[in-house]
Amino acid sequence: MRGEWQEFKTPAGKKYYYNKNTKQSRWEKPNLKKGSNLESNAKESQTERKPTFSLELVNGWHLIIYNDGTKLYFNDDSKEFKNDISQEDDSRCRSLIESLDKEKLVLLIGVARGYTMREEDIDKILESCNEEIHLFKRNQDEVERKDEISEEAGDVKSPLQESHTGLVSGYGSSSGEEDEEEDEEEDEENEEQIVNQDISIIDDLNRIDTDDIDERNIFFELFDRYKLDKFSTWSLQSKKIENDPDFYKIRDDTVRESLFEEWCGERSGNATAEESDSEDNSEDDSEVLEPTKYHYLAQIVANAGTIAPDTIPQDIRKQQKALYKAYKIKEYIPSKRDQDKFVSQLLFYYKTFDLEQRKEIFCDCLRDHERDFTGAVESLRQDKELIDRWQTLLKAPADSSSIEDILLSIEHRCCVSPIVVTEPRYYVVGILEKTVVWVRWLAAEVGPSSRFTPVGAGNEPINPE
């Protein structure tokens, strides 16, 4: 498609068109004029391109982000523009670019292209980027200063060494015994200095290791105290704890994020170990709770934040790379092709329908498969005490693992896995919303069967190969 229009396909294969200017979608193909209009549109788009954000780097370089999402590097001294800066062009500037938080730069590009954010949030992102640049410059200056001091110390030491060598070689025969005694004393002093330096270095290393362990423990306690969601992303969960003083005991957000991912993996491992222990102690192996095939991949899509009309599965994989690894998506779905195919179908629902509409689509899915749930639905509905306990847990600020346990328990008792393995509608909401709708449906709180049938939703099965 040309100009302001983009063409997309639903999972069912039906085409629809998205207007980048109005942010609206339509089924009908727009009437596009050819010829001179295409050239004028191209010229117009070029003249409309304006710088939106500018970050001052080093050595006269600036990173400029334009309103169409493109970025260029401009040098004040040479007045030249570059699409990229290589090590050969400027190694220091290249190192700075690689050290910047890519997630923040992506957000700035998104805002430049029209993504809506609060002004104070944009200011925080810019302030954080400038702080990263300032810290990089300060660290580089310290490294250069230490190098200069080392070179100066080497220059001062060299004449002394040469002088000492000259004395030993020129006058050693005339004052032999005195020189030998002095040499022995100097050797002993040097050995003591070396030993003391080694002890000092070991103490420093031990202190560094202890500091790292302390910071790790502080952050793990912080995550536990605020009951962060181990199935969510750092960009979302960090907002819950950024006002706590302990949050700033580590200034590097990359280190914070790596600790969060480590905490998520450890908590997931602990949960698995507990399930394994209970499984060993239980005589009934049928109570082992296993998630459905697309359980975690669907949750990654649910946690992806704002999904743009042109988002593709590869974008989700790149943005959520850490979660793909943490939740071992490859073990559940070995084929990347099948992973992307499933994500592509979910993206259609997330682009086309809001959360409330997707909840209704999920509820329709439950109604359609009610007879397939092996009669367990009626049995659960009669267990009022269990449903009341679930509702109480959902109303309270329960942690994510408790909510997931409810969902897995329902799915296990209803034998959901073989039924929904090829049903995309079952995955159009996240774990929390899915659990809430399940419990409300079992409690018969969702009202009469008012069906929501989205046009072109393409409720075809996933059909993984």
Swiss-Prot record:
Any single GO CC term annotated in Swiss-Prot or TrEMBL for this entry: U1 snRNP
InterPro entries xrefs: FF_domain, FF_domain_sf, Prp40-like, WW_dom, WW_dom_sf
Keyword Nucleus: yes
Subcellular location as annotated: Nucleus
Chief localization: nucleus
Region (Disordered) location: 28-49, 144-198, 266-288
Keyword field: mRNA processing, mRNA splicing, Nucleus, Phosphoprotein, Spliceosome
Domain called FF: residue spans: 212-266
SMART domains to which the protein is assigned, alphabetical: FF, WW
UniProt GO BP: mRNA cis splicing, via spliceosome; mRNA splicing, via spliceosome
MF-aspect GO terms: RNA binding
Residue(s) carrying Phosphoserine: S150
Keyword Nucleus: yes
Subunit structure and binding partners: Component of the precatalytic spliceosomal complex B. Interacts with PRP19.
Further facts: Present with 1310 molecules/cell in log phase SD medium.
Protein name (Swiss-Prot/TrEMBL): Pre-mRNA-splicing factor URN1
Organism: Saccharomyces cerevisiae (strain ATCC 204508 / S288c) (Baker's yeast)
